Amino acid sequence: MVDMDEYLYLVEDNSLKDYLSDKNFEKCDFIKFNWAISTDNNLVHYDNRSLLERFKYPFLKDKFVKTMIRGNISDLKYWVHSPNISPLRNISCINTGEKIITNKVHIESVKPINLEKAFIIHFRFKSTEELINKFKRGYSNWFGNNIINFLKANLGDYFDQNKITLEKINYVEKELKFNLWYYRIRYYFCKILFFDKVCYA
């Protein structure tokens, strides 16, 4: 259900067993959890403190979900975030226990976004340096082995979800030999528009 950079966060319960004991989940085959994405907290370089110490800024709410699946479902096919099975099995729940009745249980987004009882924390961008190291380790076939598409997609998401600063831009350009003129223009535009305050993209 979760990747190595994701964690299930329980707001009220001390264990997954306690959380699942809620009677609202008794007839659900799937539980859908919204993402909450952590920003880089303006960390350019790797910081060896614990995640809870490093990331104090509010999480960014996200409509996309990851799905917890009940065992012993034989007709299950899995695709990225959510299951896809026979239309006959059509009861799923959001994390509060509220039911979603649909024959499209593979839906990958749930609105309104609800982080009331549980959610998936996605530590996607922990620092600029760690993002660069990810690039240098290589990339998957998701982008058709096209490094330019990979860089554009990930850098675009990074600067859309984190504060743009000259320090970050300069570091990326230095390490990747990649011209970020577009983000440099956005940085100065924000600086002028918001009276010298560094803004989110």
Describe every region a protein language model picked out:
Residues 1-9:
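Short beta-strand-to-loop acidic/aromatic patch adjacent to the donor-nucleotide binding site
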Residues 10-201:
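Catalytic-site signature of metal-activated, phosphate-bearing donor transferases
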